[in-house]
Amino acid sequence: MWFKNLQVHRFSAPWSPSADEVEASLAKHAFFPGTSLEMQTQGWASPRDNGPLVHTVGRQMLLTLRTEKKLLPTTVVNQVTRARAAEIEEQQGYKPGRKQMKELKEQVTEELLPRAFSIRRDTRVWIDPDNGWLAIDAAAAAKADEVRGMLFKALDPLPLINLHVNQSPVAAMTEWLAGDAAPAGFTVDQEIELQSGAESKATVRYVRHPLDPEDLRRHIAAGKRCTRLAMTWNDRVSFVLTDGLVVKKVAPLDVIKEQADGTAHDEDERFDADFTMMAGELSGLLVDLTEALGGERKA
């Protein structure tokens, strides 16, 4: 249930539609399986099997954007197109021109699409309207951009902006390592990436490796800056902070898992309990992380 990544956003103005209102808006852009000739289809799906498009617990909302894509390798299309082109050349006595090759490739694609396999990818969105957070569970910026585009399309107007802080993650993370002191409530873990600002982009990575403060300071003195840092918040949640203010590798620690054990009687109750706990913990983490980065900067 827990999100593994957080692409963090803020509401720039109060946003408090009811779950029913959000449901009605998403329903206009709901997911439907694509036809045999569609390369990709996208729409909102239920976070739970056959449930509503907006899963709510209290004021917390959970959404799911589903993407279905046909797997049709370019190499296969090109191979069949070349074979067809050779047949045409033999028939007409000369090679097909550029326009004819383009039309032939489109024809081959249409013929192969119905036989192509489909894969589905779900990307989840957590909305905390009371505290003004919206987070997308996506590691890559491109996937987050897709979700944002669909959110703006379905929930217009949506006063959504990226989280802005007063101190850049790179400057803050480098400062913490140079001073061998994590911000209050956080500890530094054994995964670090230091990168040079020079054209070479020389990079040093520590993965599950004991950290030597003097060694880190030497790298920083040589001009390297921290672009990736593993941390733990209040002994409850571990994560990796990136230079782009993306929170990755989010994982609840044992103390949270122990609290969750035995509190639910069935799968639905367990899902809601996990979602409630995740929302509460991540909201607290984001507040403290924002403060550690100098506080929120209003755009």
Curated annotation (Swiss-Prot):
Keywords linked to the UniProt accession: Cytoplasm, DNA recombination
Subcellular compartments: Cytoplasm, Nucleoid
GO terms under biological process: DNA recombination; regulation of DNA recombination
Any one Gene Ontology cellular component term annotated for this protein: cytoplasm
Top-level taxon of origin: Bacteria
Summary of the function given for this chain in its UniProt record: May be involved in recombination.
Name recorded for this polypeptide: Recombination-associated protein RdgC
UniProt lineage: Bacteria, Pseudomonadati, Pseudomonadota, Betaproteobacteria, Burkholderiales
